[in-house]
Amino acid sequence: MIILPFVFRAADNGLDLAPWQPLQTREMVMATVNLEAEPGPLSVDLHKSALVIIDMQRDFLEPGGFGAALGNDVSRLRAAVVPCREVLGAARRVGMLVIHTREGHRPDLTDAPPHKVLRGDPANRIGARGPMGRILVRGEPGHDIIPELYPLPGEPVIDKPGKGAFYQTDLELMLRNRGIDTLFVCGVTTEVCVNTTVREANDRGFRCIVLSDCCASYFPEFHAAGLAMIKAQGGIFGSVAGSKPLLNSLAGVP
């Protein structure tokens, strides 16, 4: 005997039964692309892939933000903006799931560990007031994503209190619900939030492909080391690829 699942649905005379159908939240692309990467070439099912753009926030990338207040050269992070924008446009065109993340805290800082809040110069600490509002506080202008990569309506935004995008968020649930097993990862900084997120994802069974020119660091040597650690020993945490091979592959998807 076969038991078919049913759901209740609204009807003029109350409720009736309808056959259950899986929820479609986006137009799926049934396509497999081949991608040159390190440590080796990959075959990727776009139906099971998502683009995760990490922390491309004004506080990190714009003059007057948190990163600049710490004495960093924000132009080094902005080098990733154009490649990210190109990949984002291609991912949207083929219907890939796009997820954005932002690091920041509640206005009362109850979700921020004391040692994190007390780090550094008191004038530039998390929660202090800067040119773009309170530093790394949710709802402030500096906390938001830069205009060049701003999320479209319907694109999920993960607000995270830590370095990794899985810690204290519903990112894993979101990916599991959509059948995602592969993540294309972009964002900043390579050695901190990108690396932490990739390691978290790897431990949860997701395959990660880090797009090297779509990531950046205030310190070029940290960027290089972060990428090297991901692809080391046969891809211990994931793979590394440039954006151009991915763009070329996506260009062939109708």
Residue ranges and their predicted role:
Residues 2-50, 59, 77, 86-94, ...:
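Active-site-adjacent betaalpha module
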Residues 49-67:
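Short, contiguous, helix-prone interaction/anchoring segments in small proteins
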Residues 65-91, 96-97:
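A short alpha/beta connector and helix-capping loop motif
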Residues 96-103, 211:
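Short beta-strand segments at enzyme active-site cores
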Residues 103-104, 161:
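Beta-hairpin (beta-strand-turn-beta-strand) motif
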Residues 106-110:
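Short catalytic/ligand-binding loop motif for oxyanion handling, primarily in non-cytosolic enzymes
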